[in-house]
């Protein structure tokens, strides 16, 4: 992660970049890249909102915590994608505070390179979720509302599975960076 001063956390230089490898599954080949927009979502009380997934699939049986997010659709920019994903998965309308950074990681099991674009987003209102059939029936998605400390502990707890480790490796540094940005905004 790039070191920066925090006098103006909204400048581009405050963005971080991480490049991670998948050490859980053997690399055979990578046949596609996926542009992903993800959100660290917080409210006026300082709570964070995440997605809980309970899965039993090719990645194994696991209970996970993950940021809201997903693939960027054709002719969609990153900011529209992140706002759409948060509304669909959490039922929350957000304002984008800033881009936190980009994490490049791999899912060797499905031969995919992920380009995760993370945004810090503030809740403006709550509404209905719009989950897909797979998100309901296969991944059993639900919403987690947690303090920063609770979220860190939950990522650590959920890293008991291979997929949980990959997600925690990708998201914990971003969550810590988001907290730094939030703290610097509050102290300004």
Where are these regions (language model features)?
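Nudix hydrolase/Nudix homology domain
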Residues: 128, 134-188
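Active-site-adjacent beta-strand/loop module that shapes the phosphate/pyrophosphate-binding cleft
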Residues: 105-130, 144
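Short, charged/polar surface micro-motifs in flexible loops or helix N-caps
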Residues: 42-47, 56-57, 73, 120-128
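Conserved Nudix-box catalytic region and its N-terminal flanking loop in Nudix hydrolases
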Residues: 47-88
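Beta-strand scaffold of nucleotide-dependent catalytic cores
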Residues: 50-52, 131-134
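Acidic, metal-coordinating catalytic segment for phosphate/diphosphate chemistry
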Residues: 2-40, 44
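A short coil-to-beta-strand element that immediately follows conserved catalytic motifs
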Residues: 93-101
